[in-house]
């Protein structure tokens, strides 16, 4: 019955969590597109994490498509380990990466060269305490070399802060379809963490509680859409995206 109207209060949906649940083919993407279009009409800011490359051709004004990249300089060691796909139970390899992934590496002009150099120091160390991790250090060397080849279009230490590519008042579609599930989770967690921090700073400034110069990007609420949210916010275990989305 086309005479039955269904209306959505945009102010309410941008101020709380919203789940769009339905079986395959029942119109979830169409509803997302419609909501996005309506928010776009009032110059709102939308961010869609597009896991299946479904929204990059969205036909609405002010669409900003971003191919998701990860700047390893901005990650913590455990996040970088996930992106490099070091196994969770490879404790010694994880330790090698933590020891090598120093602040000096993050700030180095030649990121990969400096990281490889730090791992190489562990491989060739004469310290008896470090000899026991030598085999794992060799393996981490291989993983880092392999990652530069396999993830060349994903890992980019020269891109700066990915947040700079998001535009206020636009529909920002972050294409994460080329990332593995773990990589997408790390990237999503990073964006969500930064967005939460940004909105907190904006809220404090809006109520006149901060004397600092403007240190936020979005003065108005941001509507974030996580496609396949059950993958990144699972019920049975914790993830970076789950933590920051909560």
Regions found by a protein language model. Give the residues of each.
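Conserved NTP-binding/hydrolysis module of P-loop NTPases
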Residues: 65, 80-84, 189-197
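Charged, amphipathic alpha-helical linker segments immediately N-terminal to NTP-binding catalytic cores
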Residues: 1-2, 185
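Loop/turn-to-beta-strand initiation segments
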Residues: 43-47, 168-171, 219-223
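Flexible beta-alpha connector loops of hexameric P-loop NTPases
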Residues: 65-70, 85-86, 177-183, 230-241
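Helical/strand "switch-coupling" subdomains that flank nucleotide/phosphate-binding cores, especially
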Residues: 59-60, 68-172
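Glycine-rich phosphate-binding loop of nucleotide-binding enzymes
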Residues: 2-70, 241-245
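Conserved P-loop NTPase motor cores
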Residues: 183-246
